[in-house]
């Protein structure tokens, strides 16, 4: 159990951000009928929304972006719903439960990428793009190579996330509902395909909004009940937690989870720039009507997420007090029933009884569905819009493109289910770290420099992007997580767990060097086109709005 918790602590920063990979062995719980009934209510309601959305999806624009008619407030809630995962809720509260103050550092660390998105990316992305971030990256560069690179970066990130999500979903549902792992994986896969296949972005958006509201309500109620228990005094909360925790006052000391400054910096950069390169997050900015609404989306999303991560800190300390000190929630060996990831779930039972426990369990499942739906749509659009319609079959009709997108949804769903079953007993937490590293090292540098650096050329973007992607993958394989823990070697060739510091540096240097040394006529033409792109990115002139978006 100690080794499982150590692995969780090491991999949680990435896992908690967007994947629901619950690492290590799980203990199957008795069938929770309250949770199953509440979850069925959620499923019926969201399938009703999907049916409603399917009647309104008439074009490619409706399918990919909900017609561009989502408001900034709605999109902010949907982004929060896409970003706040079950592992954010269960994982960070478990981290606070075991390590105290360090959990707050990690939970707030997930917000550091959002100012970059707010100030540098959101408005220009919305003004330049239509459906995917590849629209922006290829605006003045060579369409074919850039779209292939962007689509590959997106698909690798989506695939890694989906596997982690499916395995995490199976284990989590086994924990919370007492359902069989394979049934859980198939259920998530089928529902995910139904949401995206029939409802497109409109259904996905409303599933994410509903999930965000339910999660924020549930976490708020738990935090309120914890604070009520201590007379709404943080001093009492921390004092009581220190009094019952095995580590005592040490739970208030920071710095126990990252081994050295290089690891801390690499982790921070990966979180910060990886967030700004996630395809399913970037895609959400095309669902609003203009750049102003895109900016408002980030403002609202950051507020909702900041509030949520503060709540997880209170929930974690509440669990120390009300769960950790209560033998009712321990097994014969003195360990928490179901493992430390169940700390928040046990707290739900402690503060709200069996009915609220069922509600929180259902919300955790709803959370997974909202995240995988967004991932699937991002992956499908990369194939149908970036590869099929703009590379392999230029001039394809909307109907053909939508057909390819829906076929891709089915293929992604089936692959996700199969891999979820195959990876049942594997350590998949590294996949989330790798996905973040690739988003930070391949997607983010190309998006940023295509919008801000006038001297960028196709050659530089291609060389730097591929170098960043390959470096992230190779260093992750040679690092301690895969080389030692999974492959069983005695010592890692690359000593750090997080490769982002090195792979991001390689990507930016590669883009700069190969662009600066590009003296071709094509490169000169691409540099000249920057001024027109800059004007469009600032003014939005030429951007179709509303349903014509």
UniProtKB/Swiss-Prot annotation:
It is a multi-pass membrane protein. Residues 56-75, 126-145, 206-211, 284-302, 382-401, 451-461, 517-549 are cytoplasmic. One of its GO terms (cellular component) is plasma membrane. The keyword Ion transport applies. GO terms for molecular function: acetate transmembrane transporter activity; glycolate transmembrane transporter activity; symporter activity. It is found in: Cell inner membrane. Keywords: Cell inner membrane, Cell membrane, Ion transport, Membrane, Sodium, Sodium transport, Symport, Transmembrane, Transmembrane helix, Transport. One of its GO terms (biological process) is plasma membrane acetate transport. It holds the Pfam family SSF. InterPro entries: Cation/Ac_symporter_ActP, Na/Glc_symporter_sf, Na/solute_symporter, Na/solute_symporter_CS, Sodium:Solute_Symporter. Residues 1-32, 99-102, 169-182, 235-260, 326-358, 425-427, 485-493 are periplasmic. The chain crosses the membrane at residues 33-55, 76-98, 103-125, 146-168, 183-205, 212-234, 261-283, 303-325, 359-381, 402-424, 428-450, 462-484, 494-516. Transports acetate. PANTHER family: CATION_ACETATE SYMPORTER ACTP, SODIUM/PROLINE SYMPORTER-RELATED. Belongs to the sodium:solute symporter (SSF) (TC 2.A.21) family. This is Cation/acetate symporter ActP.
């Amino acid at each position: 159990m100690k080794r499982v918790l150590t692995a969780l602590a090491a991999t949680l920063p990435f896992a908690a951000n967007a994947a629901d990979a619950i690492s290590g062995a799980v203990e199957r719980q008795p069938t929770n009928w309250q949770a199953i009934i509440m979850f069925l209510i959620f499923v019926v309601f969201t399938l009703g929304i999907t049916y409603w959305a399917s009647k309104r999806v008439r074009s490619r624009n409706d399918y990919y972006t909900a017609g561009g008619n989502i408001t900034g407030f709605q999109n902010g809630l949907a982004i929060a719903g896409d970003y706040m995962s079950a592992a954010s809720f269960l994982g960070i509260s478990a981290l606070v439960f075991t390590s105290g103050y360090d959990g707050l550092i990690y939970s707030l660390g997930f917000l550091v990428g959002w100012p970059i998105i707010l100030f540098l990316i959101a408005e220009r992305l919305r003004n330049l793009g239509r459906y995917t971030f590849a629209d922006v990256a290829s605006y003045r560069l060579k369409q074919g190579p850039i779209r292939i690179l962007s689509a590959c970066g997106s698909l690798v990130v989506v695939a890694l996330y989906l596997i982690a999500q499916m395995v995490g979903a199976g284990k989590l549902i086994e924990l919370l509902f007492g359902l069989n792992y394979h049934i859980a994986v198939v259920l998530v896969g089928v529902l995910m395909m139904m949401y995206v296949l029939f409802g497109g972005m409109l259904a996905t958006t409303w599933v994410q909004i509903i999930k965000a509201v339910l999660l924020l309500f549930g976490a708020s109620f738990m935090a309120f009940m914890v604070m009520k228990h201590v007379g709404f005094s943080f001093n009492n909360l921390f004092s009581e937690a220190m009094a019952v925790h095995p580590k005592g006052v040490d739970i208030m000391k920071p710095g126990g989870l990252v081994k050295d400054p290089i690891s801390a910096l690499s982790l921070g950069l990966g979180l910060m720039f990886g967030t700004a390169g996630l395809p399913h997050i970037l895609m959400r900015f095309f669902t609003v009507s203009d750049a102003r609404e895109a900016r408002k989306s980030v403002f609202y999303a950051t507020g909702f997420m900041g509030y949520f991560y503060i709540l997880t800190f209170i929930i974690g300390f509440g669990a120390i007090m009300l769960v950790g000190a209560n033998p009712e929630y321990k097994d014969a060996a003195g360990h928490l029933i179901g493992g430390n990831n169940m700390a928040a779930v046990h707290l739900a039972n402690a503060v709200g009884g069996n009915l609220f426990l069922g509600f929180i369990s259902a919300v955790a499942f709803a959370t997974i569905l909202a995240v995988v739906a967004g991932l699937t749509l991002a992956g499908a659009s990369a194939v149908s819009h970036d590869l099929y319609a703009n590379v392999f079959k230029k001039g394809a009709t909307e109907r053909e493109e939508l057909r390819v997108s829906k076929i891709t949804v089915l293929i992604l769903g089936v692959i996700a289910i199969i891999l979820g079953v195959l990876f049942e007993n594997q350590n998949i937490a590294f996949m989330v770290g790798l996905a973040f590293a690739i988003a930070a090292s391949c997607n983010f540098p190309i998006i940023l420099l295509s919008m801000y650096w006038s001297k960028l050329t196709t050659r530089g973007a291609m060389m730097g992007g591929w170098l960043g992607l390959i470096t992230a993958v190779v260093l992750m394989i040679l690092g301690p997580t895969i080389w030692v823990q999974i492959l069983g070697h005695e010592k890692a060739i690359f000593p750090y767990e997080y490769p982002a510091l090195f792979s991001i540096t390689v990507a930016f240097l590669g883009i700069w060097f190969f662009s600066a040394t590009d003296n071709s006529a094509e490169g000169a033409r691409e540099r000249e086109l920057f001024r027109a792109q800059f004007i469009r990115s600032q003014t939005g002139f030429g951007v179709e709005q509303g349903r014509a978006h």
